[in-house]
Swiss-Prot record:
Family, similarity comment: Belongs to the N(4)/N(6)-methyltransferase family.
EC number assigned by the record: 2.1.1.72
The protein's name: Type II methyltransferase M.AccI
PANTHER family, per database record: DNA METHYLASE (MODIFICATION METHYLASE) (METHYLTRANSFERASE)-RELATED, DNA METHYLTRANSFERASE YEEA-RELATED
GO MF entry, a single one: DNA binding
């Protein structure tokens, strides 16, 4: 039973639950609770439907959205779904006096397809494709929506698409979900459906410095939809903090009109094939001319995925413990933090090795060595061979065929991309992506010229247009984010300028290997490039 108004209009219920239920359990069911002020603002969008009688909350949790609605309008009939029995029992206790709230212990994605609702409001579970029954749920979507989606689609977007399908005439939908789908490959088909449905009205990107959801490392967006045929426009907005939530009120109160902003587009203007951050975030690339896709000069692929780093990675102590000869170990950078500067040398590798860091991968195909056989049997007894990746390999303990890449690039970043020249010529795990120069341009563009360019702020800023944003300023780049990202067309540089950059690069390398600061040199390279490629400049 909700005993006081205070419990309704804040997150004390969620805080009490989080204290009593383990983080492991909450993560298992993707329970990351929405701050009440955000839930309240989203509820206003639902309540803006003057014909509102029925509301659906597809992922009920502890009913923060229902509380937000009931605190503003008590006579609404609410139906809700929840799959976790623990939180379901808690929620039933809180809502047992509300006859107009019906909570069902059922999976929303497999139930209730034929019913329509005047309002649907939700913070759906954030599960990646391998964390839920994606084949069967995608089949449900395909059958009911006549929409075929990518097998890598995240569960939260499937909740959204089903809810849009269930809107009654003039019905409204408010979702808070990770922004990831706006800028990911699997999101293309989701965005296509949103455009085709013509229900999308607002995407409000929450650019908080702090995380919106406790314990969840993600950037969120509020998606507002309406099945009212009133407009063919969509508006993108950014809010920077909880103090800016009044902007959401302004957006809702203005509807069906929109705020005065350049970030308003017709459905026909939206391209589902591109990253939608182009619609809500200023693009760095517009400051430059003569840009080409990075894939023109190089290809980015992920590092080696073992399927079990604990089993496959080795240091000298582990090799000694299991009597594994070094000929069966592949030199590899196993931790991103072990490469500390822009150059990773053979000396760096030897120092890590002597420090007993993990710098090898088990690599023993076709060996008859009895110690190798014993270690393989150990893996099988621990069922390493049945893991998601290893189960599809023959033999299961074989490594992916990845030649050492001349350049590594960091996957996650807070202060811009890190590029590292792999002078030790060793392999890398997935904490770095591999950059391999295209064979057809090797004779045209020196690999050192490419690397010198990648070290500049200009290169990093242009790539930023293609990044994926997470909480607390964290950025992530998948290989295709970089492949499809833009870069200055270095092939247009004359020999004199190329030589000038390469000479500066040699100076920079000397300083770094001598443990000195080389920022001033990189700034000089940056200035040469911006002088050449700035939109305001003209080529000689």
């Amino acid at each position: 039973m909700i005993k006081t108004t205070e419990h309704i209009v804040n997150n004390s219920i969620e805080r009490d639950y989080s204290k009593s239920i383990s983080l492991e359990h909450r993560k298992k069911f993707a329970q990351f609770f929405t701050p009440f002020p955000i839930a309240y603002a989203m509820a206003k969008w639902i309540l803006g439907n003057k014909q509102l009688k029925t509301v659906l909350e597809p992922a009920f949790g502890l009913g923060v959205f229902s509380r937000a609605i009931l605190s503003q309008q008590k006579e609404i009939n609410i139906k809700a779904f929840e799959v976790d029995e623990t939180i379901f029992e808690n929620a039933k206790e809180y809502f047992d006096d509300f006859e107009n709230v019906n909570i069902l212990l059922q999976d929303y994605m497999y139930n209730d397809w034929k019913n329509k609702y005047d309002g649907i409001i939700c913070n759906p579970p954030y599960f990646k494709f391998h964390d839920y029954d994606n084949k069967n749920i995608l089949k449900e979507i395909e059958t009911n929506l006549k929409c075929k989606l990518n097998g890598f689609t995240n569960l939260y977007t499937l909740f959204l698409l089903k809810s849009i399908h269930q809107l009654s005439q003039n019905g409204r939908c408010a979702y808070i979900i990770p922004s990831e789908f706006l800028n990911s490959d699997y999101g293309k088909l989701v965005k296509t459906y949103l455009i085709k449905s013509k229900t999308l009205r607002h995407i409000i990107v929450i650019d908080f410095e702090e995380n919106v959801f406790d314990d969840a490392l993600t950037t969120a967006s509020i998606i507002l939809c309406a099945n009212d045929n009133i407009t063919d426009k969509v508006q993108f907005n950014n809010i920077q903090s909880l103090q800016d939530l009044s902007k959401i009120d302004e957006i809702i109160n203005k509807y069906p009109n929109f705020l005065e902003t350049e970030q308003t587009y017709n459905f026909s203007d939206l391209n589902p094939e591109i990253k939608w951050k182009a619609y809500y975030q200023k693009q760095n690339s517009i400051k430059f001319k003569n840009l080409v896709p990075f894939s023109t000069y190089a290809k980015v692929v992920r590092g080696i995925a073992t399927g079990s780093n604990e089993y496959f990675t080795f240091n000298l102590s582990k090799a000694k413990e299991f009597n594994i000869d070094e000929q069966y170990l592949l030199p590899c950078i196993c931790s991103a933090k072990d490469a500390k500067t822009s150059f990773f040398t053979k000396q760096d590798f030897e120092e890590l090795k002597k420090s007993d860091k993990s710098v090898f991968l088990f690599n023993a195909q076709n060996s008859t060595d009895k110690n190798i056989s014993s270690y393989i049997q150990k893996g099988e007894s621990e069922e390493i061979n049945k893991r998601f990746l290893t189960a599809s390999r023959t033999p299961w303990y074989s490594l992916e065929n990845r030649k050492p890449a001349p350049i590594w690039v960091s996957v996650f970043n807070r202060s811009g991309l890190r590029f590292i020249r792999n002078e030790a010529n060793i392999s890398n795990l997935t904490s770095y992506h591999c950059i391999i120069q295209n064979k057809q341009v090797v004779s045209e563009i020196d690999i050192d010229l490419l690397f010198a360019y990648l070290l500049t702020d200009t290169a990093k800023q242009i790539f930023e247009d293609n990044s994926r944003q997470y909480g607390n300023g964290l950025q992530k780049f998948e290989p295709n984010d970089l492949n499809k990202g833009m870069m200055l067309d270095l092939g247009l540089l004359d020999k004199q300028t190329s030589d000038e950059i390469l000479n500066l690069y040699k100076e920079y390398k000397y300083l770094i290997l001598d443990n000195k600061n080389g920022d001033e040199i990189i700034n000089k390279i940056d200035k040469i490039l911006t002088d050449k490629y700035s939109e305001k400049k003209h080529w000689a």
